[in-house]
Every structure is written in C-alpha cells, then in structure tokens.
C-alpha cells in the first residue's frame, strides 16, 4: 500500500512537471515570435501577440514579455503605456536593470521608476516597510552589491557595507564586531536566515564564515543597533537577516565553480522554479582552502616554539559547506538548512600565541585542531488572515555539534599546572610537550512562535499597525566532553562526573508588542518585549527590552530619533565552563561553585539620531547617523574562564552614501568612533580596543562593455590598539606571589620583599598593549558574460599588504596576503 501511494504521488508530480514544461515551451515560443516581430519593426503585431498571452506567462518569460511590451509602447510613442509595463516589470523583479542593448529612453524610465521607489525590508518591524520608515538605522545589501564587493564570505560583505562593523581576529573562528563590542567568537550579533535564528543556544555563536553561502542570497538586511525589543537575547549590537532567492527569481539551474591559490576550491549549485502556487529554491555550496604559510615576526618570551611557520586561512581537512531548501505554497512555508564550518587557529591558545605544528596533533572523530560546527535548522510556518489580523505561526528545530579543539602549547607549561593542583592527571599533562584543549558538545532546541499584525486606517493622515507575538523555546545539551591532550596524541581520562555537570536544559518564554502610528509626516514606533528564562540550575532571568522611535518624513529627506535597550544572557557554555573549571580546580561543592561562578546577562542602551536624504542628485542617496552606546556586564575571557568585568561607553558618527547609474555604481561608508569608558582586566583604558577610530569603505562597480563588468573595493582602517590580559605576566605574577608567600611563612622578610616587588612588576604589565598600523586594502574583480556563461576573476589584497589584527584574549594575529580566484558559472 505504501509503495502504491508513493507511486501515485510520483506519477502526479511527474504529470504536473510535464504540464508545466509543456506550457513553458509554448509560452517561450510565443515570446520568441513576438521578439522576432519587434526586431523587424512589426511593433504592433508583437504587442498584440504578447498582450493576448500575457496572463499565461510566468517567471522569467513574464518578465521578458513585460520588458518587450514596454519597449513596444515606447516604439509607438505611448509613454504612459510604456511606464505601466515598466512598473509591472519592477513589481515582478524589483532588482531589474536595463542592459546596454536597451534604448536609452527605456533605461532612463526604469531608473526613474526605481528611484521613486524606496526598497522595503521586513527585519526592523517583522513586517514589510520602506527604509524611510524603519525605526533604527538600517543597511540593505542587494545581490548586485554582494557581487560588486568581491566578498568571499559573510564577514567580508558586512565589513564592506555596514558602518560600524569591522573585522576582529581572536585567533578563534571567523569573527566580526559592531561598534567595538566583540567576544572570542561572533556572539553579540543575531544572524538569521529568512527570519530563522542561526545563533547557537549553547554558545550564542553564529560565525559569518564559509558555512554560509553568498550565492543563495537575494539581499541582506542589517539593523545597526540593539534589537531585543523584537528579537530578544543575542540581538545585543545588531541584527543580520539573510534573505534567500525565491525559485521564481532564479527560474532554472545555476552552477558555479572556482579555484585559486593556497588550495582554494569553491563550488555552488542553485535550483529554482515556480510551479503554479509552489515556489521551490534549493542551494548547495562548498569551500576548501589549504591556507597561506607565512613566517611573521612574532614576539619572544620565556616560552619556546617548535616552528616559525604560521598557516593563515586554513579550512581544516574537510570543506565548509551549506545545503538547504526553501518551499512556499500559498500561506505555507518550509525551510531546511545544514551547514558545516571548520577553521584552524593560526596560533596557540590565548596570549601565549605561538606557531605550532598542526599535523602532529591527534584527531577526535576525524577533527583536527580547529573550531568546528555542524548545524541543522528547520522551520515550518503558516500565515493566514483572520478578521483583518494577519497571523503567522512557526515551528522551529535546531541541532548542532560544536567542537573547540585548540592547541595550548608545544612545550611544557609548569606555570599552568599550578591552577590544576587538585587534579594531578591534568597538572601532570601540562608538564609534557604538545598540549591542547578539546571541548565537544551536542545541542538541540525546538520552539513555537505566534505573531499577529493588525493594520488600521482612521483617515488619510492617521494610520498605523499593531503587532504582537509570543514564543516558547527549549534548549538542551545532550552531551559534553572535556579532554586535555598531551604528547600530541595522548589524552587525560574522561571524567563521567564532569560530563554530567556539562549536560543540562533551559527554557525560554517571551512576549512582545509593537505599535506604529503615523500622523501625516510623523511616525511613532514603540515596542516592548519581556523575556523570561529558566536556567539549568533553576535560576531565573527576567528582562524588559523597550524601543521608542520618532520619524519625520519628507519627500526628499527624513529624520529619526530612537532609543533602544537590548540584552544577551551569558552563554550556557561559558556558565558551564566556569562551573567545570571551578569543580576541577577546587574542592568546593557543586552548588557553591554554581553560585560563585554565575554570570549575569550583558546589556546595552543606545541612543541614535539619523538624517537621510533621497535623490537630492539623481541616483544619489545618503545618510548620517550619530550614536551613543552604553554597555554593561560585558563578558570577558579571563585566560581560561569568564567574568562580567567589561563596561563600554562610546560615541560615534556613521556616514553612508550610494550612487547608482546605468553603467556605474558607488557605495561609500565612513565611521568615526570614540570610546569614552572601557575596562580591561579591571583597569580603565578609556580607549577603543581592537577598533579603529576611523574606518571607511568604497565599493565601485562599472559596466565597461555589454559583456564586461569590473568592480573594486577599497578598505581603510586607521591605527588601532589591542588591550588584553597577558597570560605570560599572569603566570609570572602567580609564581612570584607564591614564592613571596613561601618566604613570608619561613620568616625571610628581605626575600619576601624582593618576590613581592617582582610580583608587582608583573601585575603592572598584566594588560598586554600593542598598536596595529593603519592600512589601506585594495580588492579587484571582473566578470565577463558570454550568453549564459559567466567568467570571473577576483583578487584580494592586491598589493600584498602585511598586517596584523587582534581580538579578545589573544596577541597580534597575522592576516592573509594576496589571494585570488578564477570562477566559471552557467545558468541553465
């Protein structure tokens, strides 16, 4: 019976596909005949053929028909009809652009219509609204902008286009910061895929790495500032919503493959189609790189190193990949995405920061030293209008396998063993060569969401909308393993007790409401969200997240004043790590360890004032944003554990402008930021930390010929300084303090004073401070179109500029030199 049912379903699907293919072939034949009529000057005949069959056209055929109908109307000097069909075309495809072969009148008409329209996004208020009405500063990155940037991953796209976002390198996985707030990994910015959270519930991490395909994206919507009033925890500094293409956008199959220096191999496959009311989009992407071997000048200290070679940009032994599917049928939508990423740290752990021999260390389930994540995300939603209220319900499921396997040292660390005196096996391990830390956990979470949207109109000058929603999520860590590797291949025994301590589950409840009301040119947008979280130890977190924005709209400009507060709870992994370390390093009971090692949520308050101008000069848009941020309870990695010791106050100015012409585009941004208050290692440094005071980007695109398109990206960063706790000085301070204590206990006063003086000197040097020079990087690229075949070439860091970056809990990390890639793509 089951086989018979499957056979019937398969037969029906096959028939539908054959019917769709038959209709497509018929419609394509009609269009080609009309196009032939147009080319020989029989414009009225071409117009009649298309008008008679337009209702039956779908996908790219319909778009081509609307374009040709507009051209026919122009040929007959019917500007009104030409404009009508051009608007219909842009309704079908808002990102359509005229080609060099199109008449100038048609190109000008399309650009004029597009200029009169403001792009819409859904991220800022969970409903479609124009950029002018968005309550917080927002950056919209289109598919064309992604191509023009030449970016290889999401990190590079965001750094190129989003003011205030910049790359940090914590010698960890791929990372990015917003307005100077960052961590070891990317856990302060909420990253979503079509509104579905990608950040881990265990670590809060969503790395903007090669595990997220760029080819599948239609646009990227970025909210610059706190957004917990809608999205709760993790949306501390910004929200990035990745919007995929739809099947109709692609209408076929696209394949792309590339190869470059340092062992780079990249491939992408996309499939998209719309069958009646069913829209289907499927994507797959993979990337591999052996990395660039370099010998940078690193700092010397008392700890040795086995090699001078550092490998930068290595993607482990297994390629990063991203596979997924999205299907829409009327109000029903399903999405599934799985991605894998594996990034190798160039240097050893923390501020030891030494080169190491990567291939000498053992593997765990095939995983070599790296930061490795494999995730699965599924989302099923249904949208329906009921009594003028638009309702949307969603079911979500997420599953991740997380591995942090980091080399500590290739030489004995007697100073490190002091911290584990209560665990002789681990203390002994640090007296051996080739030590590393291996942490692995498997998490899963599921949730249910319900959102509603009611729109009302009192009269032409009074209208608005009321949004509301509630959500429940459950997270659990099913497995946790913690090992110390020594002698490169040996490991300490796994502790069943520690593994059990690592396991746990947490529950999340939240509700929100948002009111948007417009009185003529004035819009008030106010929202509030309440989050209630039950932690693994039954403690509670209760957070209120308000937002209030005033927007004044004019045809050519707008003003925005907004306040918002956000929070992010301390990651489960950090809290459990503190507990495990406290249990290992002392003999206190677990309950006491939990209370002593508890971490509080981080929070941020932000006040922003924005002025934006639209089309003051044809094709030119600009924005100036002034912000004040105050962040408290920021979590700082303190060698091997975590503390709420960070506080940050900063002011800044963000400038954006874009100029779009038929054959030329330019996107520019500049950020100036000054930190008023900043604390590192319990000391006020009151300066930007790993954040340039001035950073700027210019991305240019030029349609040189019908087939050739060129693009350039210039990125400038002013001098910056890194401040971190120095583990070398921490070891020295601990060693001298212990020797002083021993001398004091034996009554050796003079010796005691000498050791205390050395301990004080080490303590004074506890904050590691180094400058990084200003840099200007240049990236170039080109695309050559031959029919449906596209040839591409991109080169990054054209002048092979040598530079270093840093981040949290590390020293200076060398960056990539000149990398290039050739690619070829074909659209079937």
Locate each region found by the language model.
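Face-selective signature of the C-terminal outer-membrane beta-barrel domain
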Residues: 328-342, 371-538, 623-624, 657-660, ...
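Extracytoplasmic beta-strand/coil segments of soluble accessory domains associated
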Residues: 123, 138, 155-196
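Membrane-embedded beta-barrel scaffold of Gram-negative outer-membrane proteins
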Residues: 392-396, 402, 558-560, 597-649, ...
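Gram-negative outer-membrane beta-barrel transporters
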Residues: 518-524, 617-632, 643-729, 825-827
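Periplasmic-side early beta-strands and strand-to-turn transitions of outer-membrane beta-barrels
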Residues: 249-250, 258, 270, 274-364
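C-terminal beta-signal and adjacent terminal beta-strands/loops
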Residues: 719-723, 730-732, 753-758, 783-828
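Short acidic/polar hinge/loop motifs at secondary-structure boundaries
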Residues: 196-224
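Short strand-turn segments of transmembrane beta-barrel domains in outer membranes
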Residues: 239, 244-273, 284, 596, ...
């Amino acid at each position: 019976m089951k086989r018979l049912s499957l056979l019937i379903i398969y037969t029906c699907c096959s028939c539908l596909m054959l019917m769709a293919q038959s209709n497509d072939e018929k419609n394509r034949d009609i269009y080609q005949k009309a196009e032939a009529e147009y080319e020989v000057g029989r414009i009225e005949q071409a117009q009649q053929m298309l008008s008679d069959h337009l209702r039956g056209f779908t996908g790219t055929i319909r778009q081509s028909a609307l374009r040709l109908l507009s051209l026919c109307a122009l040929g007959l000097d019917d500007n009104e009809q030409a404009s009508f069909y051009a608007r219909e075309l842009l309704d079908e495809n808002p990102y359509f652009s005229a080609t060099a072969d199109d008449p100038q009148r048609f190109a000008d008409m399309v650009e004029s219509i597009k200029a009169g329209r403001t792009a819409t996004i859904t991220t800022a208020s969970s409903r479609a609204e124009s950029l002018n009405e968005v309550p917080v500063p927002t950056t919209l990155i289109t598919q064309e902008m992604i191509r023009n940037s030449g970016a290889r991953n999401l990190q590079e796209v965001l750094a190129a286009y989003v003011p205030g976002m910049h790359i940090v390198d914590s010698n960890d996985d791929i990372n990015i910061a917003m307005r100077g707030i960052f961590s070891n990994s990317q856990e302060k910015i909420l990253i979503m895929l079509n509104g579905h959270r990608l950040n881990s519930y265990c670590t809060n991490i969503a790395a903007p790495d090669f595990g997220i395909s760029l080819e599948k994206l239609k646009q990227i919507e970025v909210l610059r500032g706190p957004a917990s009033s809608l999205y709760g925890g993790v949306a501390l500094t910004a929200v990035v919503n990745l919007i995929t293409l739809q099947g109709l956008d692609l209408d076929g199959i696209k394949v792309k493959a590339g190869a470059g220096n340092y062992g780079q191999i990249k491939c992408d496959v996309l499939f998209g189609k719309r069958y009646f009311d069913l829209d289907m989009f499927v994507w797959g992407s993979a990337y591999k790189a052996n990395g660039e071997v370099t010998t940078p000048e690193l700092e010397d200290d008392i700890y040795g190193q086995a090699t001078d070679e550092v490998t930068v940009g290595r993607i482990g032994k297994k390629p990063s990949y991203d596979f997924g599917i999205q299907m829409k049928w009327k109000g029903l939508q399903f999405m599934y995405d799985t991605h894998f990423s594996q990034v190798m740290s160039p240097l050893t752990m923390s501020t030891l920061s030494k080169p190491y021999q990567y291939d000498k260390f053992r593997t765990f389930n095939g995983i070599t030293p790296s930061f490795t994540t494999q995730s699965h995300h599924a989302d099923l939603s249904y949208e329906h209008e009921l009594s003028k209220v638009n309702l949307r319900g969603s079911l979500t499921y997420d599953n991740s396998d997380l591995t942090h396997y980091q080399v500590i040292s290739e030489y004995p660390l007697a100073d490190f063993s002091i911290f584990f005196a209560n665990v002789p096996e681990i203390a002994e391990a640090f007296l051996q060569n080739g030590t590393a830390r291996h942490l692995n956990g498997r998490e899963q979470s599921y949730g249910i969401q319900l959102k509603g949207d009611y729109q009302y109109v009192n009269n032409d000058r009074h209208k608005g909308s009321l949004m509301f929603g509630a959500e429940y999520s459950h997270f659990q860590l099913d497995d946790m393993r913690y090992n110390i590797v020594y002698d490169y291949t040996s490991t300490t025994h796994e502790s069943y007790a520690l593994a059990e301590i690592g396991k746990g589950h947490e529950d999340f409840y939240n509700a929100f409401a948002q009111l948007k009301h417009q009185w003529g040119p004035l819009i008030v947008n106010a929202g509030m969200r309440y989050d209630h979280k039950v932690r693994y130890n039954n403690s509670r977190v209760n957070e209120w997240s308000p937002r209030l924005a005033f927007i004044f709209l004019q045809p050519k400009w707008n003003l925005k004043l907004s306040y918002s507060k956000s929070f992010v709870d301390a990651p489960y992994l950090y809290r459990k790590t503190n507990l495990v370390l406290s249990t290992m390093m002392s003999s206190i009971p677990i309950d006491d360890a939990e209370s002593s090692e508890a971490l509080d949520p981080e929070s941020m308050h932000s006040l922003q004032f924005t002025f934006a101008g639209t089309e003051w000069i044809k094709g030119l848009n600009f924005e100036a944003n002034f912000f004040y941020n105050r962040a408290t309870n920021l979590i700082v990695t303190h060698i091997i554990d975590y503390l709420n010791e960070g506080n940050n106050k900063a002011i800044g100015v963000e400038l954006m402008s874009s100029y779009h012409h038929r054959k030329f585009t330019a996107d520019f941004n500049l950020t100036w930021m000054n930190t008023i208050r900043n604390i590192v290692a319990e000391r006020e440094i009151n300066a930007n930390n790993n954040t340039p005071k001035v950073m700027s980007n210019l991305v240019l695109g030029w349609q040189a010929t019908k087939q050739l398109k060129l693009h350039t990206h210039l990125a400038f960063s002013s001098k910056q300084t890194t401040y971190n706790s120095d583990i070398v000085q921490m070891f020295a301070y601990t060693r001298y303090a212990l020797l002083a204590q021993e001398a004091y206990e034996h009554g050796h006063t003079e010796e005691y004073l000498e050791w205390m003086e050395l301990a004080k000197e080490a303590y004074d040097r506890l904050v590691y401070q180094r400058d990084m020079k200003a840099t200007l990087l240049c990236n170039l690229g080109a695309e050559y179109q031959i029919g449906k075949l596209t040839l591409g070439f991109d080169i990054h860091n054209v002048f092979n500029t040598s530079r270093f970056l840093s981040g949290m809990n590390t020293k200076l990390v060398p960056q990539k030199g000149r990398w290039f890639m050739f690619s070829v793509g074909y659209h079937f």
